[in-house]
């Protein structure tokens, strides 16, 4: 880490962090722990900050290479509390790569999730149960985790900084939080802590809380989270999943479409090789979410980029057809695959609670695909004839028509300050009006506006130019040293 204002020192730190640590781990500590901080602290004059930073990597490696014990999980928690507590004072006189700072927050939340999965698992040994009981109840407790992250948000003043950026007064995201006149550490940690809080809420099933935590971040513009592949994917996956569970399907599509495109664009060289499998798995999960959305509310393909739509068709056309034909078991299968690992008490019960809520949504949309296919054949049709076509009673088809309009009336974000903002919008390509015993059908051809197409093309061009730029940027990107 750099304790001066030398730009080169930050790049050297990034090189050690990205390359050297993983290379040494692979060669000498593939299935074992690194030496403890106390064993090597003398090499850094027993510097307290060095020991905490080193220990963060030490415990991170233990979680990646071994199965950590309850005591090691506690050690990681204690070290994070000490490290973030020290950094929250704002007195750190060093610059750190933004990649490392994001991954500190990301790993902190991962270890919380890992601990909760360990604690709520059904296959613990008697020794593990005993070790867990011996731990303080606050170790990796949700309130404690959110409290640590919220302290970073509050102490960093990041919300005020992002508000000034929205007004055009500063360019925090453009400089990636890197400032030669002061340390970037607390400010950038505060930024990514918001994303961490959002992720914790998703894991607990609080989807409105997850989106609320992102209020200060403009998710529909390039920002600090879009500069790092892992941050971009994590943010959009969890935001997309939150929208998905809230039934805001067009908003979910917007984020999932963007993220799978981004992974496709960067996977052949712009990210570290060892990070690629995780991103590809997340991409597959997002395709599964998109498949479920298009099965629940058919006709939304126009919102997808052409390449995403084609890949989705290749991967899921058969399952989409089967889901729209009423195979609810496929929804369960894809939901199990695409959802995050929920936490809270018993792991299995936490998942079942979310799956049950989603199953109710699937049931309420059961008649939508078949009814849509029937309606698209007519400009108007008698209710009794429609009932005969669907082989149901007149009362049932009337209820289905009401449910049809409700299913396609979604709350949709239209540029508000909060990710929770939105207006009720009809997103279907078929709209029905019931006039006595007559059903009138208006079919709307939905396409992206010229403005949307041009904006997307401009964004793709800008990202491509960034990747091709030969000059080394002032600030750190995940691809800077690849």
Task: Tell where the protein language model's regions lie, with residue ranges.
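Extended alpha-helical scaffold regions
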Residues: 1-482
């Amino acid at each position: 880490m750099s304790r001066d204002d030398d730009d080169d020192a930050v790049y050297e730190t990034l090189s050690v962090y990205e390359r050297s640590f993983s290379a040494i781990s692979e060669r000498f500590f593939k299935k074992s722990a690194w030496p403890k901080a106390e064993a090597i602290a003398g090499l850094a004059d027993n510097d307290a900050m060095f020991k905490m930073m080193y220990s963060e990597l030490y415990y991170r490696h233990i979680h990646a290479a071994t199965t950590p014990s309850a005591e090691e999980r506690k050690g990681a928690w204690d070290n994070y509390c000490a490290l973030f507590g020290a950094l929250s004072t704002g007195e750190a006189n060093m610059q750190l790569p933004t990649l490392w700072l994001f991954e500190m927050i990301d790993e902190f939340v991962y270890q919380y999730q890992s601990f909760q999965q360990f604690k709520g698992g059904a296959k613990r040994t008697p020794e593990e149960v005993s070790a867990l009981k011996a731990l303080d109840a606050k170790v990796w407790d949700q309130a404690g985790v959110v409290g640590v992250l919220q302290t970073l948000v509050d102490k960093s003043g990041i919300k005020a900084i992002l508000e000034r950026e929205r007004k055009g007064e500063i360019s925090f995201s453009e400089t990636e939080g890197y400032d030669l006149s002061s340390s970037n550490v607390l400010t950038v940690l505060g930024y990514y802590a918001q994303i961490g809080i959002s992720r914790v809420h998703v894991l607990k099933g609080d989807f409105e809380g997850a989106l609320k935590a992102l209020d200060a971040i403009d998710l529909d513009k390039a920002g600090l989270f879009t500069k790092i592949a892992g941050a971009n994917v994590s943010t959009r996956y969890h935001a997309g999943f939150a929208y998905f569970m809230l039934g805001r399907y067009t908003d979910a599509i917007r984020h999932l479409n963007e993220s799978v495109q981004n992974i496709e664009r960067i996977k052949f060289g712009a990210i570290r090789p060892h990070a690629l499998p995780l991103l590809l798995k997340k991409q597959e999960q997002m395709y599964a979410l998109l498949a479920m959305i298009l099965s629940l509310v058919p006709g939304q393909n126009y919102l997808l980029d052409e390449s995403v739509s084609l890949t989705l068709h290749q991967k899921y056309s058969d399952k989409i057809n089967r889901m729209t034909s009423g195979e609810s078991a496929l929804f369960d299968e894809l939901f199990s695959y695409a959802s995050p690992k929920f936490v809270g008490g018993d792991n299995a019960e936490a998942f079942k609670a979310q799956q049950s809520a989603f199953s109710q949504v699937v049931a309420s949309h059961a008649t939508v695909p078949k009814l849509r296919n029937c309606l698209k054949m007519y400009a108007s049709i008698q209710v009794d004839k429609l009932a005969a076509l669907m082989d149901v009673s007149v009362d049932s088809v009337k209820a289905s028509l009401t449910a049809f309009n409700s299913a396609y009336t979604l709350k949709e974000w239209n540029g508000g300050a909060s990710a929770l903002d939105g207006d009720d919008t009809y997103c279907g390509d078929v709209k029905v009006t019931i006039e006595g015993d007559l059903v009138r059908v208006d079919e709307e051809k939905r396409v992206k506006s010229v403005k949307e197409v041009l904006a997307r093309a401009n964004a793709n061009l800008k990202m491509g130019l960034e990747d091709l730029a030969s000059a080394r940027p002032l600030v750190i990107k995940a691809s800077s040293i690849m």
